[in-house]
């Protein structure tokens, strides 16, 4: 059975365009993969703690020396990574905030980026360990940045995902959402056209 993991990272629980479009894409992919199981990871609802001394300490303490608190932190990270590993298709709703990803998504990345677990260092450089998955990233942006030096959003996402082994990545952009009704309509129509073709 195909498993689709949808990761919502908007800072709004209702009405976020990245989430709405990610929902549409997941529904389309579910139709294309009969019997597919859908798992939704809502990062806003999860409220993962930002990377701090306690989280880093847990990740870098040998398993046989961890405290109960550290074991709980690592167990949460392990569960997030297992969820990612179990997915065949990953859909990420990733709005652009101030030229980057949401703090929720950055925190999620910090919780799943673990040396020896999701990547490793070799004599030839780093190697991602989460492989063989298709990733769709649905972005929502108030302005238009694609193809300009101000688009630090797309390369960051591609770089991080590639670092942990996720190299088959397709982007669906909805840009210009805050540039007036006509621009918003055109942006959503373009995104939905890409969703239909996915």
Swiss-Prot record:
It is an enzyme of class 1 (oxidoreductase). Its cofactor is FMN. Keywords: Flavoprotein, FMN, NAD, Oxidoreductase. Gene3D superfamilies: 3.40.50.360. GO terms for molecular function: electron transfer activity; FMN binding; oxidoreductase activity, acting on NAD(P)H as acceptor; oxidoreductase activity, acting on NAD(P)H, quinone or similar compound as acceptor. Belongs to the azoreductase type 1 family. InterPro entries: Flavodoxin_fold, Flavoprotein-like_sf, FMN-dep_NADH:Q_OxRdtase_AzoR1, NADH:quinone_OxRdtase_FMN_depd. FMN binds at residues 96-99. It comes from the Bacteria. Homodimer. It catalyses: 2 a quinone + NADH + H(+) = 2 a 1,4-benzosemiquinone + NAD(+); N,N-dimethyl-1,4-phenylenediamine + anthranilate + 2 NAD(+) = 2-(4-dimethylaminophenyl)diazenylbenzoate + 2 NADH + 2 H(+). This is FMN-dependent NADH:quinone oxidoreductase. Binds 1 FMN per subunit. The gene is azoR. Quinone reductase that provides resistance to thiol-specific stress caused by electrophilic quinones. Also exhibits azoreductase activity. Catalyzes the reductive cleavage of the azo bond in aromatic azo compounds to the corresponding amines. Its EC number is 1.6.5.-, 1.7.1.17. It comes from Burkholderia ambifaria (strain MC40-6).
């Amino acid at each position: 059975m195909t498993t689709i993991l949808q990761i919502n990272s908007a800072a709004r629980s209702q009405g976020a365009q990245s989430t709405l479009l990610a929902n549409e894409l997941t529904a389309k992919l579910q139709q294309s993969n009969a019997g597919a199981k859908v798992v939704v990871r809502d990062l806003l609802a999860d409220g993962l703690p930002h990377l701090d001394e306690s989280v880093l300490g847990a990740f870098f303490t040998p398993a046989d020396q961890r405290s109960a608190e550290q074991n709980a932190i690592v167990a949460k990270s392990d569960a997030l990574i297992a969820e990612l590993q179990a997915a065949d298709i990953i859909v990420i709703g990733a709005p652009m905030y101030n030229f980057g990803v949401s703090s929720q998504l950055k925190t999620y990345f910090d919780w799943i980026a673990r040396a020896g677990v999701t990547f490793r260092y070799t004599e030839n450089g780093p190697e991602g360990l989460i492989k063989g998955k298709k990733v769709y990233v649905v972005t929502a942006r108030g302005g238009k940045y694609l193809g300009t030096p101000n688009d630090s959003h797309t390369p960051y996402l591609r770089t991080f995902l590639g670092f942990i082994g996720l190299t088959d990545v397709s982007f669906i952009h909805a840009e210009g959402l805050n540039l007036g009704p006509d621009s918003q309509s055109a942006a959503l129509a373009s995104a939905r056209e890409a969703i239909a073709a996915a």
